[in-house]
Amino acid sequence: MTEYIHRNIDSELIAWKEDSMRKPLLLRGARQVGKSSAVKNFGKQFEYFAEVNFERNKAIKTFFQGDIDVRLIAKKISSYINVPIEAGKTLLFLDEIQECPEAIMALRFFKEDYPELHVIAAGSLLEFTLQELPTFGVGRIHSLFMYPMTFDEFLYANHEEGLILLRNEAYGNQSLDQAFHDKLVEYFRTYLLVGGMPESVLAWTKTHDFNRCRNIQEDIILTYEDDFSKYKKRVNPDLLRTTMRGICHQAGEKLTYKQISADYQSSQIREALRLLTLAGIVTPVVATSGNGIPLDAEADEKSMKVLFLDPGLLLAVLQLEGDLSQQLIELILAGTPQELVNKGGVTEMVAGLEMMRYKPCIQRQKMFYWEQKGKSVAEIDYLEIHNMKITPIEIKSGTQGGMKSLRLFMREKKLTEAFRCSLENFGSFDYIDKQDDDAIRHVTILPLYALSLLRSR
């Protein structure tokens, strides 16, 4: 039996189980991020675990045809798979539910007609199927979004719970011992290559073989592209494949449609990007003025960067495209921390992924950055809401004098708090803005291996 690796969503599933007003749960996310494994592990909390996989159990699809009687459906499933389905004792798991649109439509009726039964559904590319459904139970179904493993989960997989606890005690000017800091930096470098796909992480913990991980990552990418072909009646699979791969070449950069492909119009690439976003494969980081909350009130979707769902998969795409340079690998493995942060678009992307994944998983999260209008190249990598205030976050390593964009933004928006995220140790400093009536502003240095602390401090 495959070893299960602790996931952040485990606690969300337990909370859902104990909620007396729970709704059927729809677990959403890209293929192979660990949805099924998380539910199967969670199933140990129940006396019985009744699993239906619509890719393998095609006959069960017929149970959902015609008039929907969910109690009768549950009885039929119980008889077919020979597992008791009893309210309060059984977890009913409907996996790969995108293969049975009728089952998606039936989820709402479990809330209305069989609310005492614990029901979880999961699937990949669900949004492609949901687009064709008139409704799938808004208000009667609870969604959770799942992603590849965060850096903290990666540390758990490597049995470094003690290292996490030590790190969590450091903050501001309370820096880590250099030995622990160096160890976390090395783990972060490894994470950039191994990524967070559970199969790749598990392979790394067993073999410490980067090539084994890369083979797994390439297989996952090819599986994604095979999935696109299943929806060729709705969208051109080559367009999705071209857009997905083209995005990877612009990691950490402002997205330019023309650089993705000259064979497709911008409107076609924009639609492919929308579908890849819905499928959880990419996440746009949209430019915003940063004048107030909410950040999307003044967002400009014509200016965006794009986060690919996993750093390891990103490098696998570049490998498949013949564009993964040895220089980039050497930068990740052996470049100085300053070079890795300031020159590596992958590092900026991972920082965005980390910040997104530590937010509540009950909705698809939006990400924002700031760029000054006009000819200036001033830019803030990310804008976050921290303690109900707009907080600029720079992914850079350097001295105070190298923070021109950060200083400009804080002065323009009259902000007093900011974060600089790099591979430096924990720290902080104040500076006096001589161009703004000697206003005192505070910058916290947060290591990239500690972005999970951003929301808790």
What annotation goes with each model-predicted range?
Residues 1-16:
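N-terminal pre-Walker A segment at the start of P-loop NTPase domains
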